[in-house]
Each structure stands twice: as structure tokens, then as C-alpha cells.
Amino acid sequence: IVEDDVAFGPENIGVPREEIGKRIDFALDAVGMQAFRHSTPSRLSGGQKQRIAIAGVLAIMPKIMILDESTAMLDPKGRREVMDVIKKLNKERGMTVILITHFMEEALEADRAIVMHRGEVVMDAAPEEVFSRSEELEAYNLTLPRAAYISKKLAEGGMPVKGAFNAEELAEEICASLQKI
């Protein structure tokens, strides 16, 4: 049962029984999974399972959460669900979240992006700054977010677009560029 999975961490660190129920409520509310409290985890989607896993960590009440490839092997909808929870925890609850990912669109949503290569930090800046250094990223076998890649290729082809990093920015840049023609 989902609530048993969420209770596992607090039980193992000795949280009193009466407090565990409150923490389960808090954690399931935080990840939007209260309606699945009595569900069988094996019947949940990949994104829902990841949200329950995050709830299990939240029930411990950490100040910092480290998530390693938390959206790997999820479909786009599941990936979006998990990223929405991560952003909510950071923005609304003030939790520090360290997200390790190979999905550049996810890295773009961070306050700070750190690129490591062979155990060394090679870039540490705002995501927009990191992604503006496309040649360096390519040297580390990292790709640009899709919109940034398209923006770069359009600029290389002569379309006057500034570096766009997401679909909305790219659409605005293309429209502005077309109005100049």
C-alpha cells in the first residue's frame, strides 16, 4: 500500500507513530498523490511511482533532497509530473533540490547548472549561461535543449534569432524575425 511505502523512512529513523500519519499526509499532499494513499504501488504509472518515491523521502523531512535521474525511463507526461513536483518543493516549500539529469530541458529549469566531466566541475553557472556555450557542451558529449539547438541552427542559416532556450522563447524569436523580413 502507498501509505506504507511513504511511512517506511520515518519508521526507520524512529519517528513516533502519531507523527508518522501527519508526515504521510504532508508528503502525499506535497506530491499530489493523496487520492492514491490506499492504492497498490504496482498499479501506478511510472510518474506516479516516482512521485510516491519522492513522498517517501519528504516524509523524513529533509532540508536537501538529491534526486539522481529521477525522470529516467519515464514518458514525457511522467517526466513533467515529476518535474512539477520538484519545482513545487523548491519554490513553495523552500527545499533545496539537487537534480542529477541527462535531460537538458530539465537542467534548463534549474537555478544553477553544474556540468561535470570525468569527476571534475567544468562549468558552474545559470543554465542559460551554460547552454550558451554549445561548443564546450559538445566537447563533453552534451546536447543543447531542443529549442536552443533549433535556435542555433536557424541563426547559423541566417535567420536573425537570438539564443532561445525554450519553445515559447523560440516561437517569439521566430515571429519577431519574420516580421523583420
Region locations from a protein language model:
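ABC ATPase nucleotide-binding domains
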Residues: 137-181
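Conserved ABC ATPase signature
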Residues: 40-44, 48
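Conserved catalytic motifs of ABC-family nucleotide-binding domains
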Residues: 61
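Conserved ABC ATPase "signature" region
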Residues: 11, 18-36
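Catalytic Walker B motif of ABC-type/P-loop ATPase nucleotide-binding domains
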Residues: 65-68
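Helix N-cap at the start of a conserved alpha-helix in ABC-type nucleotide-binding domains
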Residues: 76-78
